[in-house]
């Protein structure tokens, strides 16, 4: 919230449940990141998955699809953030959205970000699979004209990457604006 890495309430956060390779917690729909409490995280399991997909007022079905598929197909993605932050979203809209290593923050992400150019705006099941495949062994996925997904082994690592990719995108776009 204070770092402006959100867009209203259209953001998702998830973390794998301890000792489970399939269950994960995801934030409720309609709650601003600055207002989310532990009690606002919903445990998604194999048993309640389909039921939760039919409760869009409780949980965004695209969040279940995107996060569930990535957690299942990308073992290193224990924590996932999906946001529409200002600079990462602007970067995702460029013809060439690849961050060049021009400073210490952009170097963190050199060759560590995949770009998903097929993003159609809704992460339903087929698209979620394509997104997970595009992420592959990298930790970050730029969604063309949309935003960013960052992953981490822990919540702290995922948030750290989210913070620094936004700073890297800001630095890179500022440098591009100089036309030098």
Residue ranges and their predicted role:
Residues 2-180:
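Glycine-rich flexible loops
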């Amino acid at each position: 919230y204070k770092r402006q890495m959100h867009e209203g309430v259209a953001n998702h956060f998830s973390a794998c449940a301890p000792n489970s390779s399939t269950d994960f917690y995801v934030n409720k729909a309609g709650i601003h990141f600055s207002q989310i409490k532990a009690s606002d995280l919903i445990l998604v399991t194999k048993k309640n998955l389909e039921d939760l997909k039919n409760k869009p007022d409780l949980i965004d079905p695209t969040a279940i699809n995107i996060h569930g598929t990535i957690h299942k197909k990308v073992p290193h993605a224990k924590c996932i953030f999906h946001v529409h932050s200002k600079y990462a979203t602007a970067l995702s809209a460029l013809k060439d959205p690849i961050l060049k290593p021009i400073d210490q923050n952009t170097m963190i992400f050199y060759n560590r970000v995949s770009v998903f150019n097929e993003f159609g705006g809704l992460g339903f099941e087929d698209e979620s699979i394509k997104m997970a495949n595009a992420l592959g062994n990298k930790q970050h996925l730029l969604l063309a004209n949309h935003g960013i997904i960052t992953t981490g082994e822990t919540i702290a690592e995922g948030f750290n990457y989210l913070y620094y990719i936004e700073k890297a995108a800001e630095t890179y776009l500022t440098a591009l604006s100089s036309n030098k």
